[in-house]
Amino acid sequence: GKIASVANCYECYGIIYNKAILEKYCSNYSGAVIKSVDDIKDLDTLEKVATDINEHVDDINKACDLHLTEAFASAGLDSGSNWRFTGHLAGLALYYEFKDAGCDLTAGQKEVTGKYMDNFKRVWDMYTNTSAADKATLDSGSLNAESELGMEEAVFYQNGDWEYANFADDNENGYTVKQSDLSMISRRPSGLRKTMS
């Protein structure tokens, strides 16, 4: 076969989440829609959890002694952040479409059918509908999703494993989150899969 690429560095991306907050949500909040973090196995369940957290954030804060402002960290569309969605989120939908079509990546794909674009839109809508950020300001450059997760204001944050160093326990960034409290859910077109614990 033809060599399409040579692996130089392995990175993974998906949804970083604060498992300590989710565990408090499951054990201390009587209205929790899941009993355990392990119940999040598909997009339907993640949507239910994110929607519930966002809609009942004040009650959850009281029950769990938290200071959340949202379920998902802001989905900034400024040039410093939009690659998370224009590249990573869209790229996943295209990858699985090309894979299903048996695409020879060295030759290219002649047609994009958008087979998984409904799920792309569904995930994007979940990000923006369960965030405290005003949708009209997503391209303003004034949002800081990393800080929202780091200060434990958000539970979920789409990014990759390279972000882990920014949440170092040395408190250099002033964040309150502990590295040991973070985990990741990878995204698939048909659902979700936890990759780290």
Predicted regions and their residues:
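Aromatic-glycine-rich donor-binding/catalytic loop that engages nucleotide-sugar donors
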Residues: 20-38, 132-133
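Short helix-initiation/N-cap motifs at beta->coil->alpha
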Residues: 40-45, 136-151, 162
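A structural signal for short loop-to-beta-strand junctions that line the ligand-binding cleft
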Residues: 1-22, 193-197
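Short beta-strand and adjacent tight-turn residues that come in two discontinuous sequence segments
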Residues: 74, 140, 158-160
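Extracytoplasmic/periplasmic substrate-recognition and gating elements
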Residues: 171-197
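Extracytoplasmic/periplasmic solute-binding protein
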Residues: 2-9, 13, 44-108, 154
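Paired acidic/hydrophobic, glycine-rich loop segments that form the ligand-binding mouth/hinge
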Residues: 155-159, 181
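Glycine-centered hinge/linker elements that transmit conformational signals in sensory
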Residues: 47-52, 96-140, 181-183, 190-191
